[in-house]
């Protein structure tokens, strides 16, 4: 099982993406109130397979429920008061030294149990169709391996995730303190709400929304680019080409576009700054506050 974990993590290397594939909705996996490691193995299949190794920690046994094609996994760490959900028992999440290998060296404090090393936590192996759809909450650290036609990942906790190169579209939503690493993709839509960061390889069309102090960094873009920041988070695009670059900032967040843009439209309300290395088309700007727009290297 350790070999499976290592091979899936290694698949995050930013190699060239394969030819685009048409994405169709796939069955969904929801993981909640859990401390766990997850490995998603992508296969030619229509259903979802789940294998669990409980590990050596004193965490509750994971419960797996099926609702049609969808799968729900409950880690048993949810708290209720008078029948009302009060969050979970997870505190003080610490990531490992290498976020390309989520869970290695990580630990988390669990109420009434103490500190749990992720290497002792349950290991969930998910065998998924090529259109991957995962929602995770709690302290769930996971990798999604190669071969996906599309990936939809929602990370609403403190765990880190790594997504290997994807043939088609990637949608990565982050709410909490965890980080997400994304390989190459045909298009990328990412929503960062909280203190976590998203780091991605080359993509085509890009849509980024940041609300909070989290950051998004993309190696390369080749397509329409839409960036929205509400808060102090930053967006960095290292290089690439975008026929239309649309930026909206409300707050102190900054945008650094290191490629070549065609038409550029910037709206700033606050102290945010926008730098575009090169613009070949029309540049429009609306600034209220101390923000600034700079074109040129």
What is each stretch, according to the model?
Residues 21-174, 179-191, 199-201, 243, ...:
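Acidic (Asp/Glu) and glycine-rich low-complexity loops/linkers
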Residues 1-21:
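Gram-negative bacterial Sec-dependent N-terminal signal peptides
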Residues 198-297:
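Short, surface-exposed interaction patches in beta-rich subdomains
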Residues 176, 194, 251:
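Conserved G/P- and acidic residue-centered "switch" motifs that form tight phosphate/ATP-binding loops
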């Amino acid at each position: 099982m350790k070999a499976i974990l290592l091979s899936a993590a290694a698949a995050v290397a930013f190699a060239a993406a394969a030819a685009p594939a048409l994405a169709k909705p796939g069955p969904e996996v929801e993981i909640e109130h859990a401390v766990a490691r997850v490995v998603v193995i992508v296969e030619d299949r229509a259903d979802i397979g789940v294998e669990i190794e409980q590990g050596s920690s004193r965490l509750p046994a994971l419960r797996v429920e099926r609702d049609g094609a969808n799968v729900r996994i409950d880690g048993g760490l949810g708290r209720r008061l008078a029948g009302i959900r009060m969050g979970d028992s997870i505190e003080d999440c610490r990531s490992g030294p290498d976020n390309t290998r989520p869970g290695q060296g990580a630990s988390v404090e669990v109420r009434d149990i103490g500190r749990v090393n992720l290497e002792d936590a349950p290991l969930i192996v998910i065998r998924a169709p090529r259109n991957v759809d995962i929602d995770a909450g709690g302290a769930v650290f996971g990798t999604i391996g190669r071969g996906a036609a599309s990936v939809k990942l929602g990370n609403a906790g403190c765990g880190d995730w790594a997504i290997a190169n994807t043939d088609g579209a990637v949608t990565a939503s982050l709410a909490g303190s965890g980080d997400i690493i994304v390989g190459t993709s045909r298009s990328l839509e990412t929503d960062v709400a909280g203190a976590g960061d998203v780091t991605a390889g080359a993509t085509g069309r890009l849509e980024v929304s940041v609300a909070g102090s989290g950051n998004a960094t993309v190696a390369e873009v080749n397509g329409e680019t839409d960036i929205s920041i509400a808060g102090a988070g930053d967006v960095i695009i290292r290089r690439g080409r975008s026929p239309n670059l649309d930026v909206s900032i409300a707050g102190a967040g900054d945008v650094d576009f290191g490629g070549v843009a065609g038409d550029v439209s910037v709206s700033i309300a606050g102290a945010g700054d926008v730098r575009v290395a090169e613009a070949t088309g029309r540049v429009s700007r609306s600034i209220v506050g101390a923000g600034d727009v700079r074109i040129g290297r």
